[in-house]
A protein has these predicted regions:
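Terminal-appendage/accessory-domain detector
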Residues: 1-91, 190, 194-200, 207, ...
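Alpha-helix N-cap/helix-start motif at coil-to-helix transitions, marked by capping-box chemistry
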Residues: 67, 92-96, 116, 120
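Glycine-rich, mobile lid/loop segments that gate access to catalytic sites or pores
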Residues: 107-204, 216-224
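Short acidic alpha-helix initiation/capping motifs at coil-to-helix transition points
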Residues: 95-96, 146-151, 426-430
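Hydrophobic face of alpha-helices
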Residues: 3, 7, 98, 116-119, ...
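Buried hydrophobic packing segments
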Residues: 98-105, 122-126, 150-158, 202-209, ...
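Function-dense linear segments that define catalytic or interfacial modules
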Residues: 72-111, 125
C-alpha cells in the first residue's frame, strides 16, 4: 500500500506543478535562494536546480534549495489540486505531508525499504492520533492535515534518520508545538498550504535540533498538560497509542481513499451515486421514448455519448435533487452555493451538478474563477438531508435521489465507490492519473525505474528527467 500511495502522491503532485499558485511559490522559494544567480536568463520561465518551469515573467536560477523549502513546495504542490489520498481516522491527508517531508531530507543512499518504513511509521502515528481526537477535532474546525501532519512528518523523519529516545522525543515535541491548520481555509490556497507548512515544520524541527544545542520538553504528550489535553481536552496515555500500534495498521484498516477526480473525498460516494442515476435515467424507456433515440447496447456506448453530446444535460428534465447523508458526514463539504471552482471542490452541489449536466465530473470546472449564474440556479435545486443512519468514523455512505418534472424518481446509494479502501485504485488507474501529465512512454520509464531501482534518489533522477519534481 505504501508503494502505490507514493505513485498516487506523485500523480497528484505532477499536474499541480503547472498551476499558477504552485509556480508562484516556486518563484518565492527561488527569490530566497537565488542571491547571486543569473536572474532573467529565460524571461518566460523559472529555473530550479537547472530545470526550466514554464510560465511567469522572470527567471530564478536556484542552485541550492534548502530542505525546508523543498518540503514546503512538495507539500503545497501535492495537495494543491486536492487530488491526493485521504484517511478516515485522520480525517485528513497522509501522503502529501509524509512523502513531502521524507523527500526533502532524503540522502543518496536511502533505500526504498527505509523510505517506506518511515512513511508507515508516520502514517501509523497520524492515524492513531486521528482516531483518538476525531470527530471532535474536525468539527471544532481544525484541519488535521496540518495539526497532526507535522507530528507525523517528524516521526517519519526520525524513523528515516534513526532517531530514538530523547532525540526522538525532542523532535516530536518541537513538531507538536508547531501544530496548526484551520478548516476555514478550504476552498482557498490556504488549505494546501497547511500541508506544505506541516512538512516544512517537521523538516525545520529536525534541522534545528541537528544543528543547534536547543533543548525542548521531552514529554510533549504528557496526559495532564501535553498536546492531547491542549488541543482536544482529552487524556491520552502512552498505552492508548501502544495498544493500537500496527493492530493491524492504519494503512490496512481503515486504509486510504484515493481519487480519480480532484475534489474532497467526502463527495466521492455522492458523485458515484449520481453517475449511476444518470446512466439509469438515460437508459430508461420514458427518456429514450421522449428524446427519440436508440438506447445504447453497452455501458461503453452510453458513456461515449454522455461525454460527447453537447446538449446532454438533464437539468431541463429535473425538478429537484436530494443528497442524503448520515448526520455530520458532509462537514468537509462546506460550500452549498460555491462561487468559484476552487470552492466547488468542497461542494456536493457543484459536483452533482456536473454529473447531471455532463454525465461525469469535469475536472477543468474546478479551475474556473467564477461559477455562472445559470449553474448556481441549477445547484439551488439540490438539497441536503440527513436521514441516513449514523455510521462509524471510518465509513461513508451517500444516497442521491433525482426527481424529474414528470414525477419520475431515480435513486442510488453508494458506500464503497472507486478509490475507497474496499474498492481501491489499481495500477492502471494510477497510470491514468500519471497520464494527466506524462506521455505513455514516459509513464513506462517511470514505472520501470520505480520497480527496478534500489535507492530512492536514482528514481527521483528519472522523475526529474521526465519533467516531474521541479524543486
Amino acid at each position: 500500500m505504501a508503494r502505490i500511495a507514493f505513485l498516487d502522491y506523485l500523480a497528484a503532485l505532477a499536474p499541480a506543478e503547472n498551476e499558477q499558485a504552485v509556480q508562484d511559490l516556486a518563484r518565492f522559494i527561488g527569490a530566497k535562494s537565488s542571491i547571486g544567480s543569473d536572474v532573467g536568463r529565460h524571461m518566460n520561465s523559472t529555473v530550479l536546480n537547472g530545470k526550466v518551469i514554464s510560465g511567469g515573467n522572470t527567471c530564478l536560477v536556484i542552485e541550492n534549495v534548502s530542505k525546508v523549502d523543498k518540503a514546503l513546495y512538495y507539500g503545497f504542490a501535492s495537495h494543491y489540486l486536492d487530488f491526493d489520498d485521504a484517511q478516515a481516522n485522520l480525517a485528513g491527508h497522509f501522503s502529501t505531508v509524509l512523502y513531502s517531508a521524507l523527500l526533502a531530507v532524503l540522502e543518496p543512499t536511502d533505500t526504498w525499504n527505509e523510505f517506506f518504513r518511515a512513511y508507515i511509521i508516520g502514517a501509523e502515528l497520524e492515524g492513531i492520533i486521528g482516531y483518538l481526537i476525531n470527530p471532535a477535532h474536525r468539527t471544532q474546525g481544525w484541519h488535521s492535515t496540518g495539526t497532526v501532519g507535522v507530528i507525523g512528518a517528524a516521526a517519519a523523519i526520525g524513523a528515516l534518520r534513526g532517531l530514538h529516545g530523547e532525540s526522538l522525543a525532542q523532535l516530536l515535541s518541537l513538531a507538536a508545538t508547531q501544530s496548526a491548520g484551520m478548516f476555514f481555509q478550504s476552498g482557498t490556497d490556504g488549505k494546501p498550504l497547511h500541508a506544505g507548512l506541516a512538512a516544512r515544520n517537521g523538516v525545520w524541527a529536525y534541522e534545528l535540533l541537528q544543528h543547534t544545542s536547543l533543548q525542548t520538553s521531552t514529554n510533549p504528550f504528557d496526559p495532564e498538560r501535553g498536546w492531547f489535553k491542549t488541543i482536544g481536552n482529552i487524556t491520552v496515555t502512552s498505552n492508548d497509542i501502544a495498544s493500537r500500534w500496527l493492530a493491524p495498521g492504519q494503512l490496512i484498516d481503515p486504509g486510504l481513499w484515493m481519487k480519480v477526480h480532484p475534489y474532497c473525498s467526502a463527495a466521492i460516494c455522492g458523485a458515484e451515486a449520481a453517475e449511476i442515476v444518470v446512466h439509469r435515467l438515460y437508459t430508461s424507456s420514458s427518456y429514450v421514448s421522449k428524446h427519440n433515440y436508440l438506447s445504447p447496447d453497452t455501458e461503453e456506448q452510453d458513456q461515449c455519448r454522455l461525454c460527447t453530446t453537447p446538449d446532454f444535460s438533464l437539468w431541463d428534465e429535473i425538478n429537484r435533487v436530494t443528497v442524503h447523508f448520515p448526520p455530520g458526514a458532509d462537514a468537509a463539504l462546506r460550500y452549498t452555493s460555491p462561487t468559484t471552482g476552487r470552492e466547488g471542490q468542497f461542494s456536493i452541489e457543484y459536483i452533482v451538478y456536473q454529473v447531471l449536466a455532463y454525465g461525469s465530473v469535469q475536472d477543468e470546472l474546478f479551475k474556473i474563477d467564477a461559477i455562472d449564474t445559470d449553474v448556481r440556479d441549477c445547484m439551488s435545486r439540490i438539497e441536503r438531508v440527513y436521514d441516513l443512519p449514523k455510521v462509524s468514523q471510518t465509513e461513508r455512505i451517500t444516497k442521491v435521489t433525482v426527481t424529474l418534472k414528470n414525477g419520475d424518481t431515480f435513486t442510488e446509494t453508494v458506500n464503497n465507490p472507486k478509490g475507497s479502501p474496499k474498492n481501491p485504485l489499481t495500477m492502471e488507474d494510477i497510470r491514468i492519473k500519471l497520464g494527466l501529465t506524462l506521455e505513455a512512454d514516459q509513464i513506462d520509464r517511470v514505472i520501470e525505474a520505480f520497480t527496478h531501482t534500489d535507492e530512492v534518489e536514482s528514481f527521483l533522477q528519472t522523475l526529474r528527467k521526465e519533467g516531474v519534481l521541479h524543486v
